[in-house]
Amino acid sequence: MDFEKELEALIFNMRGENEVYFDSFCDSVMLTDYECENGIWTGALQKALNEHSTIIIPSGEYTLDGSIIIPSGRKIIANDGAIIRLAQGVKVLMMKNSNTVDGTHFPIVNHERNEGIYIQGGTWVDWCEHRMGYGKSGMSDSERSLYGISTMMLFECVDRLVLRDMVFRNCGGFAIQLGEIKNAVIEDIRFESCFADGVHINGNVENIYVGRISGEVGDDLVAFNMFDWQDSSINFGPCKNVICENLTLSKSSHYKALRIETGIYTFDDGSVVDCALNNAIFRKIRGIKTFKLYCQTPVYFPDNGPERAGVGSGDNILFEDIEIDLDSPIDLLDEYLTSHPIKGTIAGFELGTNIGNLYLRNIDITLHRDSYPLSYLACIGPKSVRFENGGEVFDPYLSSRVENLHLENIRINGDAPSDITPYIKEIVFDRLYDDIPSTGCGKIENIFYK
């Protein structure tokens, strides 16, 4: 595949250029050269960042009682044994770059960007014992002026970002949230007793490497949510040129999915953006049972109708070297638990995006059709679940299409099937409900299997 070789070369060169750029930083200072106040290091760390390009945090424990604002051209190196924690009850995030902006109401145009932020090492600790919920931890500021932020660290409108060799612990919101990023490396990150997404990536991202991510989280280990709910988004837009590899989700993590959410988003001024994914490789992934590649609006009631949204697009997307044990539905809802004949399909790859070329290579999946007969390697098409209060979870009116599905070295329950079609499902809804549009379908035009 030409796109695969070109993408590998592009990301390799990006990583090298980033290393050369950050290696040129020579002005450094120890954080302990500054004085803390009553055991709080917020002011000292902020002052050090304002005055020097490289801050070294020695081994020890450091408490912050507010947010650190990182300007352009900065490196933070936390030595082994450095533990940086938020003080008990602090509701704002720990760190963000200086040029963040709300990109959910209007497209981001000509906004000043940061260039060059690098953080390496350290254990970064929140005070939470469970997921706190939006507006209760990880806020952008005390006024929650950026509504869709709930994270330990936020990086947006940044060119050249490197986060590596970091441990996150007890995060009540996302550990890392990104959007409007170009030329980023996120690698060697571990999560310990975190309660939401590990790495949460929103839109307008170009040239990103995510690798060697592991640990325990309460939601997605890594999420590429170019289209997402308002309370989880810093912006909306496409993502291109992605390598995401070597992910290991701990067995103790209860939600074993990886969301890759596309969609058509409408801004307040009526302009629209395709939150698309193009040129992406996801490989060497363990512990995930379902990859979700579709548009999902928030829960709505038929009388009100769903948010304005449409099916997003993608092209040249590869999943490779992945092991899946689909021992139960990822969403423990009645339709899936009871294998509803129309709405009960589950799959390792659940598709609801208009995709040009999708590649599945070296996939080893175990299906448990004795318990869940509507289990598949991949499915495409609409989804629908109704709560008891009448709320609709998905979008049964959306149709989607894959032009070319390329399958290579697929193993189902340990065997390589001669015929793959029994493991691929095109979902069709035909006037499923009377109260909302509910005639959607999924279609795969061509399947190439070897």
Model-derived regions: residue spans:
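Extracellular/periplasmic carbohydrate-active domains that bind, remodel
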Residues: 1-450
